[in-house]
């Protein structure tokens, strides 16, 4: 099976800071891949390389190759806007637009020239994000009136509405309470039927619950990547074992 994403000898710098050093890994389709590691290890930097978000930051340099379905996303003739449409991003803090719930979901599709049934697209996206039943009678109310957990699921629906292949999530539940976090985790598990998901999390219990593969990063390097059950119970590297057992973090 061809990987959905293939990362080959990836190096990334913020100015002189060599933040990612020789990362090579595959992300399989319709799986949840978790990126774990201590703060500053490069998890979020790697995630943002996967849809060219980091190149919006001045003074950065990238070397290496990232392939999506076999195509180089950093090739000179590749439009970064199209990359970000195919590989969507959900951020750590919910960031709904100051618009109605409906407009939040429809906006991306509208600016991308969607010509299908917008009402159906909004409903489908909200259902996929497990939010439809909670908001179907208030679609034209402000998204800012929703709870934090609902706002984050709305942001997931907004990402899905542009019909990506891959969804990147940067600690999507870190600002939420346990009940809202559980709902997000259930949503992620359902979404992998239709999407490939890469998630950054500091919560190792969360990684073990929802991911199929886990990659452990430390000081900008990929230390180990394996099926999640194996990485948490039978890690191959001493440093991985020390991290997952809480001896350092």
From Swiss-Prot:
The keyword Membrane applies. Part of the ABC transporter complex PstSACB involved in phosphate import. Responsible for energy coupling to the transport system. Its EC number is 7.3.2.1. It is an enzyme of class 7 (translocase). The keyword Signal does not apply. This is Phosphate import ATP-binding protein PstB. One of its GO terms (cellular component) is plasma membrane. Belongs to the ABC transporter superfamily. Phosphate importer (TC 3.A.1.7) family. It is found in: Cell inner membrane. It catalyses: phosphate(out) + ATP + H2O = ADP + 2 phosphate(in) + H(+). The gene is pstB. ATP binds at residues 37-44. It is a peripheral membrane protein. It comes from the Bacteria. It holds the Pfam family ABC_tran. Gene3D superfamilies: P-loop containing nucleotide triphosphate hydrolases. One of its GO terms (biological process) is phosphate ion transmembrane transport. CDD domains: ABC_PstB_phosphate_transporter.
């Amino acid at each position: 099976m061809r990987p959905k994403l293939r990362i080959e000898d990836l190096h990334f710098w913020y100015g002189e800071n060599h933040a990612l050093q020789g990362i090579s890994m595959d992300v399989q389709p319709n799986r949840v891949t978790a990126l774990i590691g201590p703060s500053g290890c490069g998890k979020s930097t790697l995630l943002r390389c996967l849809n060219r978000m980091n190149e919006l930051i001045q003074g950065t340099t990238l070397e290496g190759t990232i392939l999506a379905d076999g195509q180089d996303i950093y090739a000179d003739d590749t439009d970064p806007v199209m990359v970000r449409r195919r590989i969507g991003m959900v951020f750590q803090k919910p960031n709904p637009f100051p618009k109605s719930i409906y407009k939040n979901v429809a906006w991306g599709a509208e600016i991308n020239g969607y010509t299908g049934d917008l009402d159906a697209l909004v409903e489908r996206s909200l259902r996929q994000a497990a939010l439809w039943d909670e908001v179907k009678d208030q679609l034209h109310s402000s998204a800012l009136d929703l709870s934090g957990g609902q706002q984050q699921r709305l942001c997931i629906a907004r990402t899905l509405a542009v019909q990506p292949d891959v969804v990147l999530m940067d600690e999507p539940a870190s600002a939420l309470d346990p009940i809202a976090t559980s709902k997000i985790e259930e949503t992620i598990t359902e979404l992998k039927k239709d999407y490939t998901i890469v998630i950054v999390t500091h919560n190792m219990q969360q990684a073990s619950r929802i991911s199929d593969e886990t990659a452990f990063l430390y000081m900008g390097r990929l230390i180990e990547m394996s099926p999640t059950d194996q990485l948490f119970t039978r890690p191959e590297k001493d440093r991985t074992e020390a991290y997952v057992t809480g001896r350092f973090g």
